[in-house]
Amino acid sequence: MLKQVIKTVSSSQAPKKYFFKQFCTSTTEKKGRVGLVTLNRPKSLNALSDGLISEINSAVKLFQEDKDVGSIIITGSEKAFAAGADIKEMEKVTLPDAYNNDLLAQWHDLTKIRKPIIAAVNGYALGGGCELAMMCDIIIAGEKAVFGQPEIKLGTIPGCGGTQRLIRAIGKSKAMELVLTGNNLTAVEAEKAGLVSKVVPVEELLTEATKMAEKIASYSQLTVAMAKEAVNASYELTLQEGIRFERRMFHSTFGTHDQKEGMNAFVEKRTPTWHNK
């Protein structure tokens, strides 16, 4: 469904833009070497319904398979990245329903994507929206962005990694405060706490995210994937285990064409030509 291109725009100044078929609750676009997924449920502030999560997964999987795409951006609207899970879908779910159907399990498919994903966050990133942003590899925030895990106000707790990823991003005390009080972080507070990579003016968010995504996509996709895997391994390994894993990954790069090309280009003072192998 997503593979059908419906419009192509190009110019001598700008990279080609491919507009893919619009889903019910999101749109996808390929801008040069960057895949862009835009959440589009404005009436619900991009509440993350099962359908929207399914569409996000479909889009990023397509971009994962596209050899011309080196990085991916997920964004929402100026008012909301995603204001949370779709409570209307959840309010009547019973314990047997949640357990037997493994409620929210499909959300974690995003973390299986090997290409880097940048969350470009404007407005609300609350509950599931904050968790979605944290599943991405880098978070860039517009200056009016708001982050939080307010599930406690609904009589429940974060269910898609909020209690686990938040503590790794900002430490136990601050994570515990947000989860137990339902308080929010402003964009500046989130950057100071380490949740966000950088804060930019609202109108410059997508431009800055695209600039970063393009820079990442300009490198060897193979090496970038290896670097992402090495950094993510730190979540699961002890320091010494992680250092050994990193060293093995480092050694592995010497078996790639792109390592040879990169070092040869450096010595020869030229721009490398990557072959992603």
Swiss-Prot record:
Pfam families: ECH_1 (PF00378). The keyword Mitochondrion applies. Coiled coil: none annotated. It is found in: Mitochondrion matrix. Residues 1-42 form a transit peptide. Pathway: Lipid metabolism; fatty acid beta-oxidation. PROSITE patterns: ENOYL_COA_HYDRATASE. Its EC number is 4.2.1.17. InterPro entries: ClpP/crotonase-like_dom_sf, Enoyl-CoA_hyd/isom_CS, Enoyl-CoA_hydra/iso, Enoyl-CoA_hydra_C. Keywords: Fatty acid metabolism, Lipid metabolism, Lyase, Mitochondrion, Transit peptide. Substrate binds at A85, D86, I87, K88, G128. NCBIfam families: PRK05862.1. The monomer is folded into a right-handed spiral of four turns, followed by two small domains which are involved in trimerization. Belongs to the enoyl-CoA hydratase/isomerase family. PANTHER family: ENOYL-COA HYDRATASE, MITOCHONDRIAL, ENOYL-COA HYDRATASE-RELATED. This is Probable enoyl-CoA hydratase, mitochondrial. It comes from Dictyostelium discoideum (Social amoeba). The lineage of its organism: Eukaryota, Amoebozoa, Evosea, Eumycetozoa, Dictyostelia.
